[in-house]
Structures are given as C-alpha cells and as structure tokens.
C-alpha cells in the first residue's frame, strides 16, 4: 500500500457571522473575520492503495485532476464561498465545512 498526495491551489473569499447573534457577540466570536477577506488555499487529495502492476500507477492522475477541477475548483476558485456556493447558505464558510463540502462533491 502507498499513499499518493496531489496538491491543488485556489483563491477564495469569505466572511464569518451569525445572523442570530448580536453585533457584539459576532465580534467576540469572529473578530476581524466578520469582514470579507480572502485566502490562497491549498487542497491536498490523498489516494491510498496498491500500485497497479500493469500500469505502474496507483491512480490516473489526469482523471483525478479532472474530477477535482470539475467538482470543486470550478465552483470555489475566485468565489465568495458563502454567497456563490449554495451549500454554504446558512453555514459558516469555515475550513471544516469546506472539507465536508469538498468530500461530498467528490464522493457523489
């Protein structure tokens, strides 16, 4: 068994906030992240398995790149996450929620 990591990069913006909290409570919870701000993200996709003896490959990297591009990068790159991606309506655009969303995109 081996683990193959493929790294992808994208840029996106977001802001935190909870409409159910007061301005004071939002500021206490999220600080300056209440303001729209951006990040340069790095997504690492890890594939675990055995090398195919016929090809010498664990995975078709071209196919992996296409799946990530079509299902994740096209939606998230240069977006404002909580506005442009419907899944985030009513959810914080946190790194943790981004991972959940990305997994759902690839697994579906």
Residue ranges and their predicted role:
Residues 1-108:
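Charge-rich, low-complexity N-terminal segments
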């Amino acid at each position: 068994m081996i683990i193959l990591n493929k790294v992808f990069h994208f840029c996106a913006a977001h802001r935190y906030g909870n409409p159910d909290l007061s301005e004071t409570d939002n500021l206490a919870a999220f600080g300056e992240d209440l303001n729209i701000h951006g990040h340069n993200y790095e997504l690492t996709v890890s594939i675990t398995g055995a090398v195919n003896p016929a090809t010498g490959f664990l995975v078709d990297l071209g196919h992996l790149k296409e799946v990530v591009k079509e299902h994740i990068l096209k939606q998230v790159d240069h977006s404002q996450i909580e506005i442009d991606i419907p899944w985030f309506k009513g959810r914080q655009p946190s790194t943790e929620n981004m991972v959940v969303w990305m997994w759902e995109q690839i697994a579906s």
